[in-house]
Amino acid sequence: MISYPFFSLSPPGLVPPPMAVPPVEMYSGSFWNRMRKPLPLRTQVIRFTVVFVIVSFILAVALQITHERMPDPKVTKPLPDLGFELLTKVPGMYVLADCCIGFLNILSVFTAFKLYLLHRHCVGSGEPELPCNIPGVSRFFLSVWLCKENCRIELRNIHTIAWIRFITSYALLLLFRSAVIVMTSLPAPDDLCQDPPKIENPVKNVILTVLTAGGGSIHCGDLMYSGHTVILTLHLMFHWIYGAMVHWSFRPVVTVVAIFGYYCIVASRFHYTDDVLVAIYLTIATFIAVGHNADGAPWQLQLFIRWWPCCGANSREVTEDSQPVMVAFKSEELDEMNGVLEGRQKKHGGVGDGESLMFKCGAYV
């Protein structure tokens, strides 16, 4: 019989982070310990996506209020701005900023799909197959891309965790923006809002704002801080962390596109320079604060969705999001622990759930 030291064996190619499957004892006991128990990742994806939709409606209402409160451009002139003085005004550049966002949206979806393929490869599911094999196309879209130099994160469930981090950061930033744009009304810069149109149907305008992400609705005065800059920077951070794991070129490409988008926003005079700078700082700080965690969003954010009676289960199945692990013991150590267990049974009339779980996972080797 071969003897091994006490250790954990994982499936080939999988290296789980420490405490990937928290023990039962960690979340038993006090109320706050139970509140810190992570929700299933699938539940977080669904509920935080619903939260994002709700926040989008809140922002749409805030944009409506801001439009009505905006100072009259005929009376209040634009504020002095160093960016306006250094950059020549190019009215059509705002369209290019939208194009930059559209390009990054597509690239982020592609990256998220590649992260999903990495997850499948990690758990041993292999590459998916198309109904009809198209030479070159199938290999490009369905092959696993991995830049090992930038891969320092556990790949299991990485696509789900990345989406949770992205959507929660975006929701927090939009919710804070809803408050900021209403609190202080700044004079419109030298853009199309110098002659703001009247909103005839507020409800329709709110719905259009949500459905078109602001592109098909009327809103002026939402200056501090820039929503376009938020999404540009959020894509930048997403690819700086996760895109670089797929391909090394994503970092420089997205950085150039984001910087060009910032330039377009200021050069078109749709935002003051401070609107852009504050949005960049807040987005980077929020994305870092939310962080990447095997449990998904920080437990403080999960408190806002923990009480929901719908949209997913509130208890985590061990096999859903966790790393399957087999624990091996030396035979003499297992005999000794079984003796301790029998002694506790005679003395206390039973054992705890955690002890039972541990010995069920034990194996002779």
From Swiss-Prot:
Q: What is this protein called?
A: Phosphatidylcholine:ceramide cholinephosphotransferase 4
Bilayer disposition of the protein: Multi-pass membrane protein
Q: Where are the transmembrane segments?
A: 45-65, 93-113, 166-186, 230-250, 252-272, 276-296
Coiled-coil region: none
Gene disruption phenotype: Elevated ceramide levels and growth arrest; cells were arrested in division but replication of DNA and organelles continued giving rise to cells containing multiple nuclei, kinetoplasts and flagella.
Return the EC number.
2.7.8.-, 2.7.8.27
Report the catalytic activity: an N-acylsphing-4-enine + a 1,2-diacyl-sn-glycero-3-phosphocholine = a sphingomyelin + a 1,2-diacyl-sn-glycerol; an N-acylsphinganine + a 1,2-diacyl-sn-glycero-3-phosphocholine = an N-acylsphinganine-1-phosphocholine + a 1,2-diacyl-sn-glycerol; an N-acylsphing-4-enine + a 1,2-diacyl-sn-glycero-3-phosphoethanolamine = an N-acylsphing-4-enine 1-phosphoethanolamine + a 1,2-diacyl-sn-glycerol; an N-acylsphinganine + a 1,2-diacyl-sn-glycero-3-phosphoethanolamine = an N-acylsphinganine-1-phosphoethanolamine + a 1,2-diacyl-sn-glycerol
Summary of the function given for this chain in its UniProt record: Bifunctional sphingomyelin (SM)/ethanolamine phosphorylceramide (EPC) synthase with minimal inositol phosphorylceramide (IPC) synthase activity. Specificity is likely to be defined by residues in the lumenal catalytic domain that interact with the polar head groups of the phospholipid donors.
